[in-house]
Amino acid sequence: MVIIQTLLSSFFIWCIIIAFLGMLQGEKKSAGSSEKNTASNDKAENFSRFAVVICAHDEENVIGNLLENLQSQNYPAEKFHVFVLADHCKDGTVKKAKAFANVTVWQRTGGERSGKGAVLNWGMEKILQKQNGFDRVLFFDADNQIRPDFLQHMNDAFAQGAEIVTGRRLTENPFDSLISQWYTLYWAVVNSLYNRPRQNLGLSSMLSGTGFAFRMELIRDSGWKTYSLSEDIEFTFLENLKGHCVTYLNDAIFYDEQPVRLYVMWTQLRRWCTGDFQIAFRYFGQWVKAFAKKPSWRLWDIFMGVGMTVFFGLTAVSYLIHGSLLIWQGQFPLLAVSTLVSYAATIAVGFAAAAKSSWPVKKLLPGILTFPVFYSLFSYISLQSLFFPQKKWVRIEHKSSKMHF
């Protein structure tokens, strides 16, 4: 049992090692850092032309905030155009989006509403057909809000050679509930202990659904084609197989509304886990061929990153079985110690992530002290998704208020 636990835990151990080495390495300037190459972007010909893509399904409550943010960018208006992909919208999303200049709204009414991946497959094909000279594609969800310098930072990153860039996701509603606190800590872990260390080590970061961009030539011939419920992770995985690395841009900050209720959290995490399983089953053979042909730490790391979610539930089961055996053998002190160590370690991770992300630790203390509960639920959801995968995309309602920058 100990051997099985060690094998399953190897994914988490690997991530801990990378996080530790990345922090020891020290800060490597991200492409597009505010301290680099600002002078070279004074001339208009050095500005990339962005196709800004927003997926929306009944988002009239929030999409106006993002569109206002885009109009307030410190970036030439003629160098980007917004495409709103309105998927089976029955509210005022289309009307609200059309009221903004520099915005094209396409309404998808055919077929069933099957999630963002299908909408992007449809919308990106239309954008590619237009041939309007776009250099980059930038993706947002309708509930996002962005700082005025977001596009400028993205442009700087591409000017310095980046191929795929992801920004730093922060929570719009960090203190609304215990659930939103957990999400705030989770994204702090992703930013500070997953993506940033990999940036420092020259490995690939992971896309996370929104707030990312890439060079148009990556899909100009093949188009955008994803099949899983986690189109962001799928795109990351496929591009890494082709040799394209994801750059993490700490200065490109965007905000995302997080769930506040357990049911909504459960639904979202189940979709993520189902998508990761779909990716693992579909592309494992391709990964083996790519790694055998040209082994690299980058390919190994991206496999471990996806595998961590895949084996999350199995790891929890192994520890549950191990704990049951300890109880049956009467080794209660050993069980208590191992449980407390695991609990304390997870709290320490939450505390470190919050501190490194400059969140007020005192205000997040309820979330930090119960962070192990979040990961315990996450592991159960992962196991549930393995045997009972989520079949359809489920909408999450957004109600976030406007932020002021």
Locations of the language-model features?
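A conserved acidic beta->alpha catalytic loop
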Residues: 86-94, 110-112, 145
